[in-house]
């Protein structure tokens, strides 16, 4: 997994909230999770391509949830080579760190959208339009759950 632009996962406190982002050009999925319980939940999807409204919405989420850190999914091909979106996701992670001063950690997001789509279909969301509305938030949840399962502190 690539190096994170902020502190290492060990630098996170044992307790606190994390927000995770599944970055895309048209949508950003957002999930929330807790370090203590090590559970992630889909939160919402930010729509639109303009940077200013996206960061304004993220600022509101940070104010509401008061996270101790942020996680950004980093795409790569199955063989681990960088994806076309890797540089854009890394730039987004750096912007989050620069704007908000929180630790921003990267997490491998390979196949998270495919896993989210499969989970939604299995849960009974068969209409593709309905799945599309929540797909990115569920992908962010999968990214954050993977991060919580593979990094940081031992389960209480």
From Swiss-Prot:
GO CC terms of this entry: cytosol
Localization per Swiss-Prot or TrEMBL: Cytoplasm
Xref: CDD domains: YqgF (cd16964)
Pfam families, sorted: RuvX (PF03652)
Molecular function, one GO term: nuclease activity
EC number(s) reported in the record: 3.1.-.-
Broad enzyme group: hydrolase
Any one biological process term the GO annotation gives: rRNA 5'-end processing
Keywords attached to this entry: Cytoplasm, Hydrolase, Nuclease, Ribosome biogenesis
Its job: Could be a nuclease involved in processing of the 5'-end of pre-16S rRNA.
Cited NCBIfam families: RNAse_H_YqgF (TIGR00250)
Family classification: Belongs to the YqgF nuclease family.
Protein name: Putative pre-16S rRNA nuclease
Taxonomic placement: Bacteria, Pseudomonadati, Pseudomonadota, Betaproteobacteria, Rhodocyclales
